[in-house]
């Protein structure tokens, strides 16, 4: 940090210059990432559960996922699970308790500001996801994963899925009490893991509910990644589904999010 000086009787008095907005945001981002990686519950959500699901589901019959080799269909779904773990469940729980203890209101009155706080949260989510993808990618490669599709399309789906679930997580955290956010975020997470079309594609469910599952953002995210990584095609329908959910989430945050 640079310092400016002012003339007073008796000499020069240093006057610290204000840090740039981006420096403040990056400092908060580093704090958010460090806090998440040191939190046992967050590590369980972001690393342990996705890794366990990856190794466990890699042994299921190909009929479960409708594709062989199984690992090629499982890995994109586990990437989707990792995104939901970080951008939705982890973000909602952390923000909910920060809101309860007045951290959001306090940070909103500092040089970081509300926009800076949201920017730091968003960047920290992306950084943690990158760590997850490296960790899971290495594990999947050990199991034989060999993606032949389009990484460019996959990145588009990942960014859109992150924005979608982050907006939904913030909406949950900004409208409910911390305890309610904790309970509902975990219930939604477990529900999506089981019946959200994440690891097992929506078209493998009974016809009566497969169409409903395909409308969920979790299914759109996982199916979009499978289309990109396996077939190398742009998942237009899944992208539109995510865009709709993202727009709804952003609208809800702008309208109902409360800082205290």
Which residue stretches match the model-derived regions?
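Short, membrane-interfacial amphipathic segments enriched in basic
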Residues: 3-29, 208-218
